[in-house]
């Protein structure tokens, strides 16, 4: 009998830290399901979610201000373990009667923490003995007075209260960040909290997830037929195989060539599915429809929503040609939901609408099926490995549903698409040739509709600009710009400017996420 993968779960309340998604990844790596929600989530949701424990993330607020963020008071009435990290520790202290103030010495970066006084959270965990831990600190506020019933469990030379605990209530606070890799024993500490203190069983495994997803798809779809919007990427391809296992011939895949794909991508996708997967795939050439819909539109959010609406119109047109199509399946993943919905908060601003989340029309005639919307990208890839997806497909960099439309700043024109395709092809080809493709997690070119002065021979030129973007990331929620070799960038830049007549300048994007997003629009 399959274990219930959602029976034991952790709720992570997000106070805005750049590391919050890492907490979720670490908890899931332990084998326990968790969800992210904004700190102001309503009490009814928390009760219904019924977590085995709560983690309060760090955040940028100054906890001593009267209007700073606070944890929902209900979590202290649920009789479940709570772990506060950095800001989460500080607000827990204040809300339970303690006191925090500006630190005498701010701590940013590596620090050594000494654990003291027995606690189930830190007991026996150290780096080389003497109860010392190498950790990552990032704070200018510190707890100065413990709430009643709490005791000190960790300190540094600069921060006397670097950890506290109310062992009877299973409340814990850490001023350092156990979720980041710089804290060497961080995963061990989180596992101690999740597995031992919260007593969560490790049911969140790839095999269990696959079994649950296939079962749920069978129950949801029944004897009806389902249409899948197939992009050729990992996400929709994994959904295709899951649906094939669940409902077999009831599945029809529709690959929409919207004229915004990379060079020869449509043919490559059709060939891959014909050779590796026995699913029915219909190719729809809809370039004219998408270009007309995008005509004169220059706003990123509007472009995403236009793309989403156009896709749905195509899918509904195809559904009418087939029999008994009641469901539309998509490869929506958890980061799409988080960025589009603001982790279920009424206050959080949407970063960007994903075409398959925020871009869907309210008048959708088909019932939506999103089997992997709870999964991070690396979890989807693990499922793909077990399901037998081709290696080249699993290792292929993500490509956004709106395609090149959001890699062209402003209006989308055929001329811009053609230029961008050439530049992107050169960049990716050289990454492969120089054995660099698999050292980065996503790489692409961006077309900038601005012109820059250049020189060709003795002549002045005034043409467009291309930006190259490459990042390293685990879950695509945070990302570090890739330090590609200068000689390589020089090679790519020269090829682009020499081989594409309308490009006079190439730049390299050195923005990390946050504060930037991976895609430019």
From Swiss-Prot:
EC number: 6.3.5.2
Pathway: Purine metabolism; GMP biosynthesis; GMP from XMP (L-Gln route): step 1/1
Annotated GMPS ATP-PPase domain residues: 204-396
Gene Ontology terms for molecular function: ATP binding; GMP synthase activity
Pfam family, one: NAD_synthase
Keywords, alphabetical: ATP-binding, Glutamine amidotransferase, GMP biosynthesis, Ligase, Nucleotide-binding, Purine biosynthesis
Ranges where the Glutamine amidotransferase type-1 domain occurs: 9-203
Reactions accelerated catalytically: XMP + L-glutamine + ATP + H2O = GMP + L-glutamate + AMP + diphosphate + 2 H(+)
CDD domains: GATase1_GMP_Synthase, GMP_synthase_C
Residue positions of the active site: 86 (nucleophile), 177, 179
Binding site for ATP: 231-237
EC supergroup of this enzyme: ligase
GO cellular component, one term: cytosol
Chain's role: Catalyzes the synthesis of GMP from XMP.
PANTHER family assigned: GMP SYNTHASE [GLUTAMINE-HYDROLYZING] (PTHR11922:SF2), GMP SYNTHASE-RELATED (PTHR11922)
Subunit structure: Homodimer.
Protein name as it appears in the record: GMP synthase [glutamine-hydrolyzing]
Organism encoding this protein: Vesicomyosocius okutanii subsp. Calyptogena okutanii (strain HA)
